[in-house]
């Protein structure tokens, strides 16, 4: 089993956990929680595909959770928390404040992360509630720990950011693409929605719900289905739709994994990063699988960075496609079923 650098660092301290009831959360990227010897293990994932993949590897599905927020019930009877720091500090604070608000006093917490992700800011960020100390470091990762001395007050609504675009209200949580500002690529794609769009529309990787809200702004009769594998994104999309009095079906899905209908239009601003690394897998899978979910007059319309060459895949899977809009940074592609 290949372990991430963060998990390798925790492994060096495995003796600490043999008699402990351990709760794993955060940016877990491997199967290490299954191999660490503990008295009891619980795990919470925020991404649909991570949870499903993990459940396939174990007999006892009760230890694996897929919840937006940690609850006291979920974390009860655990005396140690192992938290994997994500790439975004605001997401880490959001998740850790939630955890600290639910955890009993004197619960021990271990935080591990890559130096480049901002994990070194954790002691200052959390000093009101935990006195954290560095206990180990290796291969550009750091492990810090401490005891929870005071419970945090956590209110979900306090972490939402609100963005405005063309009188639309866009709601965003930490860890969701477009949290700090509406992405320029998404705005470029949204600018192509000005002509009236009808029929069924699938929004892949819906994030904050910006694309769906923009489309419904111009085409209120369109029937939207929004999918994402991130629980935070789905919550944001629901808040965005509600804030603008729009309707849409919110579905937990890793690309097409939970999609069973055909659509007249598929829209997306697909990610090309996996954590801190560039990764084109999602773009490739989206293009390769699109025709299965399009009607015979259907269309795939997406935006991506102009340095990403999509021509080979579009030529392979679609009879005709066009670049319908572009800037110095982005291109919007339009591909037709036939």
Curated annotation (Swiss-Prot):
Species name for this entry?
Answer: Buchnera aphidicola subsp. Acyrthosiphon pisum (strain APS)
Molecular-function GO terms, alphabetical: 16S rRNA (guanine(1207)-N(2))-methyltransferase activity; nucleic acid binding
**What is the annotated localization of this protein?**
Cytoplasm
Show the catalytic activity.
guanosine(1207) in 16S rRNA + S-adenosyl-L-methionine = N(2)-methylguanosine(1207) in 16S rRNA + S-adenosyl-L-homocysteine + H(+)
**Has UniProt tagged this entry with the keyword Membrane?**
no
- What are the UniProt keywords, alphabetically? Cytoplasm, Methyltransferase, rRNA processing, S-adenosyl-L-methionine, Transferase
- Gene encoding it? rsmC
Q: Which leading EC class covers this enzyme?
A: transferase
Q: What is its main location?
A: cytoplasm
Sum up the protein's function in the record's words. Answer: Specifically methylates the guanine in position 1207 of 16S rRNA in the 30S particle.
The EC number(s) attached to this protein equal 2.1.1.172
Subunit description: Monomer.
The entry's family comment says: Belongs to the methyltransferase superfamily. RsmC family.
> Any keyword Cytoplasm?
yes
Question: Which InterPro entries does this one have?
Answer: DNA_methylase_N6_adenine_CS, Mtase_sm_N, rRNA_ssu_MeTfrase_C, RsmC/RlmG, SAM-dependent_MTases_sf, Small_mtfrase_dom
Identify this protein by name.
Ribosomal RNA small subunit methyltransferase C
Q: State the GO CC annotations.
A: cytoplasm
Supply the Gene3D superfamilies for this chain.
Vaccinia Virus protein VP39 (3.40.50.150)
């Amino acid at each position: 089993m290949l372990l991430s650098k963060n998990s390798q660092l925790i492994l060096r301290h495995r003796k600490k956990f043999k008699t402990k009831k351990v709760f794993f959360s955060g940016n877990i990227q491997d199967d290490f929680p299954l191999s660490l010897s503990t008295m009891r293990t619980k795990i919470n994932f925020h991404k649909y595909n991570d949870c499903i993949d993990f459940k396939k590897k174990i007999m006892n599905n009760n230890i694996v959770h897929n919840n937006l927020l940690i609850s006291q019930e979920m974390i009860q009877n655990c005396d140690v928390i192992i938290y994997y720091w994500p790439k975004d500090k605001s997401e880490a604070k959001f998740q850790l404040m939630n955890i600290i608000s639910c955890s009993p006093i004197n619960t021990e917490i271990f935080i591990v992360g890559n130096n480049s992700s901002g994990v070194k800011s954790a002691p200052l960020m959390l000093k009101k509630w935990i006195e954290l100390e560095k206990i180990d470091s290796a291969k550009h990762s750091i492990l810090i720990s401490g005891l929870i001395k005071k419970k945090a007050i956590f209110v979900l609504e306090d972490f939402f950011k609100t963005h405005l675009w063309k009188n639309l209200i866009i709601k965003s949580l930490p860890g969701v693409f477009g949290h700090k500002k509406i992405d320029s690529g998404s705005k470029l794609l949204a600018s192509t929605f000005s002509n009236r769009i009808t029929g069924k529309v699938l929004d892949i990787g819906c994030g904050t719900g910006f694309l769906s809200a923009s489309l419904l702004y111009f085409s209120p009769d369109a029937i939207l289905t929004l999918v994402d594998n991130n629980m935070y994104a789905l919550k944001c999309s629901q808040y965005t739709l509600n804030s603008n009095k729009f309707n849409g079906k919110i579905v937990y899905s890793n690309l097409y994994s939970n999609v069973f209908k055909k659509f007249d239009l598929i829209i997306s601003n697909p990610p090309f990063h996996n954590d801190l690394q560039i990764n084109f897998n999602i773009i490739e899978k989206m293009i390769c699988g699109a025709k299965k979910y399009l009607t015979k007059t259907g269309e795939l319309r997406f935006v991506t960075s102009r340095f990403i060459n999509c021509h080979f895949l579009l030529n392979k899977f679609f009879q005709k496609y066009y670049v319908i809009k572009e800037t110095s940074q982005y291109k919007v592609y339009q591909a037709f079923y036939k």
